[in-house]
Amino acid sequence: MCDEEASALVVDNGSGMCKAGFAGDDAPRAVFPSIVGRPRHQGVMVGMGQKDCYVGDEAQSKRGILSLKYPIEHGIITNWDDMEKVWHHTFYNELRVAPEEHPVLLTEAPLNPKANREKMTQIMFETFNSPAMYVAIQAVLSLYASGRTTGIVLDSGDGVSHTVPIYEGYALPHAILRLDLAGRDLTDYLMKILTERGYSFTTTAEREIVRDIKEKLCYVALDFEQEMATAAASTSLEKSYELPDGQVITIGNERFRTPEALFQPSFLGMESCGIHETVYQSIMKCDVDIRKDLYANNVLSGGTTMYPGIADRMQKEITALAPSTIKIKIIAPPERKYSVWIGGSILASLSTFQQMWISKQEYDESGPGIVHRKCF
């Protein structure tokens, strides 16, 4: 660990989870849900020190009495007041640092509205008095973490999925594709198909239970039709899950029907292409000379790529789309849930990166627009 006096902070604000820690570390110190919860009921016990709002794990543990909101939807910050609370919680409660003493590296999804990035910059400098900051593209950081400079990253988190082709360290902006289909949509879909089984999950708190079912039991089928037939013929694929109240529910084909929506968005009533086709289209938008290198370096990143079986299925689907002579390789690092953060930690600790920071002085001279000039 480099001296914590001035070491940079790396904060990866995902739609679902916030990952935060110090540059140079190999894993984030704090990982907590990007949730702000407000009580749904009137407090009656005076002197209990009840708060009017809870953030992160505390909101998660009191979810039964709270209404939970996610300030980031589809990778875009939609509620800035709540987002400020999340950042405040990150700096003061989780990392226990004074933000005015450390440079901060933040992350964002590609193809985000420009205003989103400007407002992030403004809040860091004006609310938290950061000495310096930088905004990096999530997928680029994942590639850093995998130790490559060329490849196509499929980054799929809770709010947004995107494919970013990178060649020799340069992202190719014309070929970046974004798919507003990710973990949260899969959770909602699982809620819907569990209702068909007669299990009702409706509140924001119950959605969190379904998310846990999804993370523990779902997987990607190599051959969907065949798997459906197996599930119909026998109970070999069924698993049980105990709810917080002790009730046990059984889930069968829902286990692989849920993530199948990544490959067949029509399940969710969406007209977009599946993730495999999105990757393929993204590669096809690149120059013909570099496609071969991209096919050989498909890097998966983000929590929604954590399903067992997803790499094999991607291999199968992309092989079917690509020219037959081409070598296709899917790289699924075991730490891919945090690879954006890890990449940020690597980037912020590089000596060559130190001149890239936007300083408070530069911000005071040029205003929030500087972020477009200094960050890719």
From Swiss-Prot:
Residues 1-2 form a propeptide. N-terminal cleavage of acetylated cysteine of immature actin by ACTMAP. Oxidation of Met-45 by Mical to form methionine sulfoxide promotes actin filament depolymerization. Methionine sulfoxide is produced stereospecifically, but it is not known whether the (S)-S-oxide or the (R)-S-oxide is produced. It catalyses: ATP + H2O = ADP + phosphate + H(+). PROSITE patterns: ACTINS_1, ACTINS_2, ACTINS_ACT_LIKE. Keywords: Acetylation, ATP-binding, Cytoplasm, Cytoskeleton, Hydrolase, Methylation, Muscle protein, Nucleotide-binding, Oxidation. It comes from the Eukaryota. Belongs to the actin family. This is Actin, larval muscle. It comes from Drosophila melanogaster (Fruit fly).
